[in-house]
């Protein structure tokens, strides 16, 4: 968590001190953890659960459960889950870095990424629900 705090603070300082960097570029780099937490809180409130209690409905957990259907080794599933998420985010970072000063482009990319996340979340949730 401390590395994330320092990274986020550094990115915000870079955007504040450099007029060429859109603040939405920083938002693009930080959207996933923020959205995951917000989405989790909303999901728990909707299901009448405490927002502070853990649950097993996070995107990475659903992806892990999905991969369990293909590989029986927990280490492979865990590694693949991390690799898939990191690869997606790495590709996304390269895409949003193409035009880091264009605010409209950055807002469009945040929106697209949230749509992609939500789409795959719903798909994984349905697949996992039918397997259980």
Give the location of each predicted region.
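Alpha-helical transmembrane segments
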Residues: 1-132
């Amino acid at each position: 968590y401390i590395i994330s705090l320092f990274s986020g603070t550094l990115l915000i300082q870079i955007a504040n001190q450099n007029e060429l960097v859109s603040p939405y570029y920083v938002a693009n780099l930080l959207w996933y953890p923020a959205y995951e937490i917000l989405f989790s809180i909303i999901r728990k409130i909707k299901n009448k659960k405490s927002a502070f209690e853990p649950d097993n409905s996070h995107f990475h957990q659903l992806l892990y459960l999905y991969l369990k259907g293909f590989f029986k080794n927990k280490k492979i599933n865990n590694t693949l889950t991390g690799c898939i998420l990191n690869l997606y985010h790495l590709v996304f970072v390269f895409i949003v870095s193409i035009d880091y000063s264009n605010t409209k482009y950055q807002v469009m990319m945040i929106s697209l990424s949230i749509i992609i996340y939500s789409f795959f979340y719903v798909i994984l949730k349905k697949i996992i629900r039918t397997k259980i």
